[in-house]
Amino acid sequence: VIISSRCVGIDVSKHHLDIFDEAVGVSERIDNATHAITQLVARWRCDALVVFEATGVYDLELREALHRAGIRFARINPARARDFARASGQLAKTDPIDAQMLAAFARAMKPATEQAATPARNALAKLAKRRDQLVAMRAQEKNRRSEAEDRAMAERIARLIEVLNDEIAEIETEINALVKAEPELADDAQLMRSVPGVGPVACMQLLTQMPELGRLGPKEVAALAGLAPFNVDSGAYRGKRKIGGGRKRVRDALYMAALNAIRRADRFKAFYDRLRQAGKPAKLALIAVARKLLTILNAMLRDRKIYKVAPST
């Protein structure tokens, strides 16, 4: 673990950033704009650790500036930050207070830093996010169509669904073209797609949401994806192991990939069946398959080796 001489917490919003730099002990606010962020990052050395909550595209300028400056940063799940604040006795919540708590989190917890994404991955992430939005809109419209009060309304909704289908198809074409045009993305995608169950959607989410894949250990990537089980124990009580936190899009994509894998590959089907025969619930067994898939993918990208069919284990 690299010991940081300077920990910085940043609360990110659409229009501004609230910063608490523990080295100076003062909070400040700047515009969430390229020029202001560049000036801010120029103050820090490469031994700084910057922590902020994952906020989708609002932190993109910040991430790119930190990457260019060679400064380590960690994006954390907002729930994890809030739990830390409560455990520290901080119940008040304002943007400056949040920034201060994130700096304290950086010092106390030393979170794993994020592998900065390339411009191509950032472009892919924007397309993937828009695709996710359109898919969610389509699902809503399909529900409305099933509840339509008359045929005319159902047909009106159906026309909108067709528009969404066309837009989704267009974005998927752009995504495929971008992946093929970028050698690093194309190579990673080829490795991922060789694994049974990993289709284009899971591949897209892993490319955009897990740039660390292949660069960290299995426990670390499982924690980032929210697939690492944690204990719920107290005294003599032994609760069920649970998963949570992490990157929801990655976790959801791997869960669907696990469903496909147990249908298509004997290795994963046998692993799933053993867990079920041992009394594990179906959902827990699928989560275990998802974690196994992630572990395999991580090793493949680390070693740059394509998937090979292995005997059931």
What function would you assign to each model-found segment?
Residues 14, 56, 80, 208:
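Short, glycine/acidic-enriched loop or turn micro-motifs at the edges of active sites
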Residues 48-58:
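Short glycine-rich phosphate-binding loop at a beta-alpha junction
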Residues 277-313:
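Basic, amphipathic alpha-helical segments enriched in Lys/Arg and hydrophobic/aromatic residues
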Residues 3, 67, 74-194, 204:
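Long, charge-rich intrinsically disordered scaffolds of nucleic-acid metabolism proteins
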Residues 24-49:
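Nucleic-acid-processing active sites and adjacent nucleic-acid-binding tracks
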Residues 200, 205-278, 282, 309:
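Phosphate-backbone recognition surface of nucleic-acid-processing proteins
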Residues 2-22, 102, 134, 204-205:
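Gly/Thr-rich phosphate-binding beta-strand-loop-beta motif of the actin/hexokinase/Hsp70
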